[in-house]
Amino acid sequence: MDRKQLLQKAENIRANPPAFFQVAGLHELDEVTTVEDHFIKEGKTDTIHFYIIRPASEKKPLPFVVNIHGGGMIRCRDILFARRLAYASDCAVVSIDYHLAPQYFYPYQIDETEILINHLLQNAAQYHLRQNYILSGQSSGGNIACAVTLRSIQKRQLQKPALLLLAYSWLDLHTDPNDKPDDCPDERKEQYRFYKDCYLCDVDDNIAEVSPALSPSSVFREFPETLMIEGGLDELREENLRLFMTLCDAGTTVQMQFFPESMHGFMVNQKADWKKAQKIIQQKVSEVFSEKM
């Protein structure tokens, strides 16, 4: 497909989300959290849209989590996960409404996330934030989070996150779904091929910013502490296990919480062991920020 055909298909997918995307409890935190709408224009990117979510009762400057949603780089998602995290961990959560593929493709989403984090750190007082942050991503958002973290190490133009949170991340865009070891229905395989075509345009799909699971341990020697959430029924399970072992070999402090009966997207889509997984993340965020105070 050419870019026009990719866009038409992506717009149709966005207009017809699966029923399970309509998660329960969307407004359950309306009274105990606040959601601020923000826009900035910096660098060569278009205007960046993001939300800052914080506990409604909290008035002091807060450390913050930057959360990058999943959706194959082509879908928008709601901010319920971010609201739960902010409320439970007594922190601010910045949810970036990154520009979607195929209109915007690699490395655009990485660039704008890096720009936003630098902006928040340099203007922390304006946003009532502290200058320490955690980076979080689910599925394709985990891919972006890995890439931004790698840049913070390699280019030294961004403060490294205090913690990296990865949930069932898409970490190998090089290997065709037919050649991956995990069970995956043919329809899902076609979806992953489509997502890749939307996100990449004349790019080597084997580089660390695109397929971190295939990179050697030397790439990750200065990686921050990392917490990984993975499901035993996730079609991306093996590439997440591979990155986990690579981080171990690199000497990174890394922990994986594995839920055998959970599938891809379970934590945000509120399936299987989602409550346990979210609680683990909430507790870890609280722990890390308390150490950095």
Residue ranges and their predicted role:
Residues 6, 27, 34-293:
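Alpha/beta-hydrolase superfamily serine-hydrolase fold, recognizing
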Residues 1-40:
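An N-terminal hydrophobic leader/cap segment in hydrolases
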